């Protein structure tokens, strides 16, 4: 069981599996740990993305982010904002085993642990930028190891059925290497990295 392996080897787990109910997800993990007879994990839960807990429908509709959208004839069933990396770093600083978040900017799942591990501050813009790029490369899993790049007959990628998920090996100077588990399918190359780097990158 992966959970037991991580707990026994002090491998932190950070995930946005909380979706609309991070607290519920944490409770479910506790249930799983009991069934698997692992030690009880210490879980940090990041909340705050659900605007309905803090704002009325009118306040949400009047906010600048809603400009140009007409929801006047509809009830708001959900309104969430993206949280950033700092809450993840703060949770890790409390010596938790697992951090569960809800709606979070994708790159924060990598940047948060890096902020915690290296003690980066807001002034460390180059390092934060490097961590953000690392998170962007990892955010879609196997896209960076060839799944996004693959175009059979034009851009062939070996053994996609057994594609390896990416691993980032990060250094304290902000440099990092993207690789994948040995013996897995897929491809890590300048081309696969470049395609994922440009993914969802728009004209600023």
Regions found by a protein language model. Give the residues of each.
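Catalytic alpha/beta core domains of metabolic enzymes, predominantly
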Residues: 68-85, 89-93, 99-101, 105-135, ...
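Catalytic or ion-translocation cores adjacent to nucleophile or general acid/base/metal-coordination motifs
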Residues: 34-51, 111-152, 156-157
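Glycine-rich beta-alpha junction loops
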Residues: 21, 47-50, 100, 105-106, ...
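A conserved active-site cap/scaffold subdomain adjacent to cofactor or substrate pockets
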Residues: 126-204
